[in-house]
Each structure stands twice: as structure tokens, then as C-alpha cells.
Amino acid sequence: MTNIRKTHPLMKIVNNAFIDLPAPSNISSWWNFGSLLGICLILQILTGLFLAMHYTSDTMTAFSSVTHICRDVNYGWIIRYMHANGASMFFICLFMHVGRGLYYGSYTFLETWNIGVILLFTVMATAFVGYVLPWGQMSFWGATVITNLLSAIPYIGTNLVEWIWGGFSVDKATLTRFFAFHFILPFIIAALAMVHLLFLHETGSNNPTGIPSDADKIPFHPYYTIKDILGILLLVLFLMLLVLFAPDLLGDPDNYTPANPLNTPPHIKPEWYFLFAYAILRSIPNKLGGVLALVSSILILILMPLLHTSKQRSMMFRPFSQCLFWILVADLLTLTWIGGQPVEYPFIIIGQLASVLYFFIILVLMPITSTIENNLLKW
């Protein structure tokens, strides 16, 4: 008799995706981040659901409802901090996952890569609207500053901003709709993630060498299920260390002050995972130019397959490209640091140089370096 997991209509799908899936025999720990992102998403949806049971999306009570969750709800504090720090873990995994894709040339799977970029945008949107919900000072002013950027769009900008706000400023209507968006978006992310997996399983996984691995496949279970479980344990360990020992390490103290439209905080800045994009936005003195640079900094990922000039897929055997990749990582870390600094000398010029370098490496240096490597190998 054939095993039920291979015949049952639903179990067959699960089987082909997580059990009998043929996987390359040499994929490293950099391939763990996909499953970790899945775990992060499930964790965020569950903790978010329990928070939503006690949260009220009204300007008068939002801040105190979050305080109530932390003080009066059973284990409310741990649920709240798991959700807040879970977002940070989500973005750490996302950046590692995207970095892996860039390093090993996974972007040549066009459909998978493009859905991935859409997923990145959706997760960033979810995190942004979620940050507004506690209705602290940084929530309010972050929402005001970022939504205001849309007013840079010619002709329709002002109308668009007021339409999103639901009035003439960030107020009750804005908070209510942001809560609605924050609730629905994770389920859209889950659906997109399934499409992402669907496209991936059409082609099979890439591997560190970038060479087709059809001749050497192993079943996903038990080899990679056990490897994923180790990754999950390390993720949960790191998350719980943050939650239990330094829950506010990555947050902003200003968000413990209730939102006050009459008092602007001295330094308005987003959460750490948006700082690199915020630094690029601030490095251009023109409003529309800054917005375009901000969007381009993420949208540039869609161009990666077009900018790939190397005859090899992966960077594994391309030392010059490897150097450039790690310079790009250092540049992004520099931008992250600059995004959290005040707008004054020398941070302005450092931010501008780092922003120019970011686009220059991706658009100019990487394609040229790949061509040089091809010539050195006489290809």
C-alpha cells in the first residue's frame, strides 16, 4: 500500500514541499533563512493576534491599552516584547536571506526573486504601520514624516497624503486604518510566501557553487529538517535573550512618551532596520529626489539579474566580486549608523558618500568586475 502522504491530495502537497523534496546535497547554513523567515512570520501572526485581543486602535486609548497589556494582561509583557523584537529578528533573517541571494546568484530564478522583492516591500510596509500602533511620540512623528514623503509626488501628492491620513493630519482615522492594514498584511505576506515557494520548487534550490545539482540530490527530510530545527532553536534562543534581558535595546525611548502633536522629538528616526534607507533619503537635499532614492535603494534588487555579467552564477570562485560584496555590506552598515545620527557635520557628508557608493557598487563596479573576471579566466 502506498504511503498516505503520497496519495492524499493535501498531504501530497506538504510531502512534495517539505519531505520528499529533492534538495542539493551541499547547501550551507545560508539556506536556513527561508525556513527561519517562515517561523518568524508564524510567531509574529500568533503574538500579534493575542496583542490585538487587548489593543484598542483609538488615539485616546491606544497608548494606555499597550501599557495595560504590559501591566495587567497575563504574560502580556512577554507577548508584546516577543512581537516587537520578533520584527527585528524577521529583518535580520530577511537581510541575510537577500544577501545570500546576491552572493550566490539566486536572483537568476527570476520569478522567485521578483516575488521575493515584492515580499520585502510588503514586510517593510507591515513593520512601518505596526510601529505607529503604540501611539508614542516616535510612532506619531514617524508616521507624519514618512507619509508626508508622498506629498513629493507631483500634482497628486497632497491629495494622496490626505487620503491616506483620512484627514488633514495624522489622527484617529490614520491609526484605525493602520491597525487594519497591520492586521491584513501578514496574511498577504503568507500567501505571497507560498507563491515564492511554488516558483522555487519549479526550479529547485540553488547551491553555493552555482552549478546545477540535478545529479546529486538528497531528500529534504531528514537531512534539512534537522538542520532547520537547529536554526530555529538558535533563532528562538537569540530572540528570548533579547526579550528577557534587553527588551528595549532596539527600541526608541521616545516611544514611551504618549504622542503629542504639539511637541516634536529632537531626532525623528525609524526602527534600526529602516535606518539604511532613511540615511539614503536624507542624503539628498531635494524632497522628490530623496523619495526616489529611497524607493530605488530597494527596487534596485529587481535589476540584479540584468546587471549580472559574469559567466559564473555564484561568487564562490570570484574573489574580486567577493571583495565588492563585502564592501557593499560594510557600506550598508555605515548607512545604518548614519541613519541614526543627527543631521550635522560630519554625518551629512559621510551619508552622502555612502549613498553614492551604494548605487555605484551595484550599478557600475559589480558588472565591470564580473567582466574583468571573465577575461582573466579567458572566457
From Swiss-Prot:
Its main location: mitochondrion. The keyword tRNA processing does not apply. Binds 2 heme b groups non-covalently. It is found in: Mitochondrion inner membrane. Keywords: Electron transport, Heme, Iron, Membrane, Metal-binding, Mitochondrion, Mitochondrion inner membrane, Respiratory chain, Transmembrane, Transmembrane helix, Transport, Ubiquinone. Heme b b562 binds at residues 83, 182. It is a multi-pass membrane protein. GO terms for cellular component: mitochondrial inner membrane; respiratory chain complex III. Heme 1 (or BL or b562) is low-potential and absorbs at about 562 nm, and heme 2 (or BH or b566) is high-potential and absorbs at about 566 nm. It holds the Pfam family Cytochrom_B_C. This is Cytochrome b. PROSITE patterns: CYTB_CTER, CYTB_NTER. It comes from Cervus nippon. Its cofactor is heme b. Component of the ubiquinol-cytochrome c reductase complex (complex III or cytochrome b-c1 complex) that is part of the mitochondrial respiratory chain. The b-c1 complex mediates electron transfer from ubiquinol to cytochrome c. Contributes to the generation of a proton gradient across the mitochondrial membrane that is then used for ATP synthesis. The cytochrome bc1 complex contains 11 subunits: 3 respiratory subunits (MT-CYB, CYC1 and UQCRFS1), 2 core proteins (UQCRC1 and UQCRC2) and 6 low-molecular weight proteins (UQCRH/QCR6, UQCRB/QCR7, UQCRQ/QCR8, UQCR10/QCR9, UQCR11/QCR10 and a cleavage product of UQCRFS1). This cytochrome bc1 complex then forms a dimer. InterPro entries: Cyt_b/b6_C, Cyt_b/b6_C_sf, Cyt_b/b6_N, Cytb/b6-like_sf, Cytochrome_b, Cytochrome_b_C_euk/bac, Cytochrome_b_N_euk/bac, Di-haem_cyt_TM. Heme b b566 binds at residues 97, 196. GO terms for molecular function: metal ion binding; ubiquinol-cytochrome-c reductase activity. A ubiquinone binds at residue 201. GO terms for biological process: mitochondrial electron transport, ubiquinol to cytochrome c. The chain crosses the membrane at residues 33-53, 77-98, 113-133, 178-198, 226-246, 288-308, 320-340, 347-367. The keyword Mitochondrion applies. It comes from the Eukaryota. Disulfide bonds: none annotated. Belongs to the cytochrome b family.
